[in-house]
Amino acid sequence: MTGPLGAGPQALPAAPLEDWLRERYFQAKTDISSSGVHNYTFGELRALDPALLGTRELDQLMFRDGPSLGDERLRAAVAARVRPGPGHVVMTTHGSSEALYLAFAALVRPGDEVVVATPAYHSLSGLATAAGASLRPWPLRPENGFAPDLDDLRAVLSDRTRLVVVNFPHNPSGACVDPRGRTELLDLVANSQAVLLWDGAFTDLVHDHPPLAEPSQDLDRVLSFGTLSKAYGLPGLRVGWCVVPQDLVSELVRIRDYLTLSLSPLVERVAAVAVEHADALITPRLTEARHNRRRVLEWAAASEGAIDCPVPRGGVTAFPRFTAHTDVTDLCERLLARHGVLVVPGRVFGQADRMRIGFSCPRPELERGLAAISEELGTHARGRRRGTG
């Protein structure tokens, strides 16, 4: 294996988000940390296709290796959903994480310049670092509510830029380009020598405009990524995909031959049903999330300046700043220890005074989480007053 990531896992930096969630996720009683919609059960999925994995089908399922690009039925379902552009094909993967790994391993060499929208999910920056790339942040500025400023992107692009890596809607802030901004972004990349990596994990979770179109419809040098973990409520299936230029397929398959080879036929059968019934899974969760988003914004507005919350334009997370804190990590620890409430401290995204709050959960769970935060903020404020009295 000749790619820079072939140097071995020791080249990969720690993943602070996963380090935070690893044990706390299983300790929490109230989870308002998640960047995905709340999960579906197998029974709920089977209700969409009662024949799914019945006794007869299970008995006939052959546990053989799958095709390198993925099961044909699942690939066809994804293609019908996302509509890849000319010269692009769908490859299914073990979550979008595998697809991202394959892309960075295939495309990046030591010293390459990689532009990453920042703050970033750890895979988007960490894989570039492990590949020996020179990172150039495209800053999504907190003072602008993390709204993407394409002039800032223009300023960091150069003739040495190998990749431009974006994630819209953005994790953790929920910021998003609108359709006009998408067109301008694609034009900027088209006029450079760079390849665009478009993380579309949250594509279906938008609040102010229709979902953004698949970028390969308008750009040749692009790979896009999707997953069942965020909008579909099926993270435990560990299924994702990439839309990849045909001329790059053989390189991704070559690298995959050293990793996972293919997906389980059992998992791909379940995943195909999910994608074929995408709207039935996504629509109710998105409707619920929009109601909950309104509640989070009302809660923040009622905090008398203690919480400054940019409006999430997409996704199901808010990323508010806590104005009396320079680092909310201790607050997050207290929420879990005293209330059983799980949130994510902003330091894992390089924004220590912020907290990621997931709002796609049942309303009672969200209310418990917000009430616990308010209680801890009140305790903190009273302590400060005593300390200065």
From Swiss-Prot:
CDD domains: AAT_like (cd00609). Pathway: Antibiotic biosynthesis. InterPro entries: Aminotrans_II_pyridoxalP_BS, Aminotransferase_I/II_large, Capreomycidine_synthase, PyrdxlP-dep_Trfase, PyrdxlP-dep_Trfase_major, PyrdxlP-dep_Trfase_small. Pfam families: Aminotran_1_2. GO terms for molecular function: amidine-lyase activity; pyridoxal phosphate binding; transferase activity. The keyword Lyase applies. Its EC number is 4.2.1.145. It catalyses: (2S,3S)-hydroxyarginine = (2S,3R)-capreomycidine + H2O. Its cofactor is pyridoxal 5'-phosphate. GO terms for biological process: antibiotic biosynthetic process. The keyword Lyase applies. Keywords: Antibiotic biosynthesis, Lyase, Pyridoxal phosphate. The modification N6-(pyridoxal phosphate)lysine is found at residue 230. Belongs to the class-II pyridoxal-phosphate-dependent aminotransferase family. Involved in the biosynthesis of capreomycidine, an unusual amino acid used by non-ribosomal peptide synthases (NRPS) to make the tuberactinomycin class of peptide antibiotic such as viomycin and capreomycin. Catalyzes the dehydration of the C3 hydroxyl of (3S)-hydroxy-(2S)-arginine and the intramolecular cyclization to yield (2S,3R)-capreomycidine. This is Capreomycidine synthase. It comes from Streptomyces vinaceus. The lineage of its organism: Bacteria, Bacillati, Actinomycetota, Actinomycetes, Kitasatosporales. The gene is vioD.
